[in-house]
Amino acid sequence: MLDKLITELDKGLRTLCAPAHSGRAHPDQDIAEADLSAAEKKHALGLMRVNHCGEVCAQALYQGQALTARDASAREALRQAAQEEVEHLAWTERRIRELGGRPSLLNPLWYTGSLALGVAAGVLGDKWNLGFLQETERQVGAHLDSHLSALPPDDARSRAIVRQMRDDELQHAEMAHELGAAELPAPVKAAMKLSAKVMTGSSYRV
């Protein structure tokens, strides 16, 4: 158990402090940079910072869930989702830098809270563990859809990243469903949405 904790601590430090790396090509690599106005660039930066913070939260959530998952298939589903979230971290982090910004200063706070939630979800049992994965990815997918509408129309690079992230998240939700994810109670879903609203509002600015 101590080895597991050390491994997860190392993952956490790398998530928060080290540049992320993608095994796949960046979705925007062949797309030219648009000539955005200062206001458009600022807005795109805020949205991509929100998306990066969301991926930090996802990493922590899945790490916490994997620590307490009992079933091998559930652990593998969480591992696979977490690996793709690392790629999302790399994509959004680079885009933030290209837009002239930096990641949210609140990332450590959100990481800690998400890790605790992940551990708690895993303790409840694998069907609820997968249920949290399924609902998280559904909500993130809907959130990314809203960003596709909100991003500047000419910012094709950010839009390509967000579109691929959305497709990945929905695949994760479907994978969790196929593995027997439980449907979370409505109050839990509402609490998750409220938490996400606070996170998005704060990380857009800070």
Curated annotation (Swiss-Prot):
Entry's EC annotation: 1.14.99.60
The keyword Membrane appears for this protein: yes
SUPFAM superfamilies: Ferritin-like (SSF47240)
GO molecular function list: 3-demethoxyubiquinol 3-hydroxylase activity; metal ion binding
GO annotation, biological process: ubiquinone biosynthetic process
Intrachain disulfide bonds: none
Protein name per its UniProtKB record: 3-demethoxyubiquinol 3-hydroxylase
Gene source species: Chromobacterium violaceum (strain ATCC 12472 / DSM 30191 / JCM 1249 / CCUG 213 / NBRC 12614 / NCIMB 9131 / NCTC 9757 / MK)
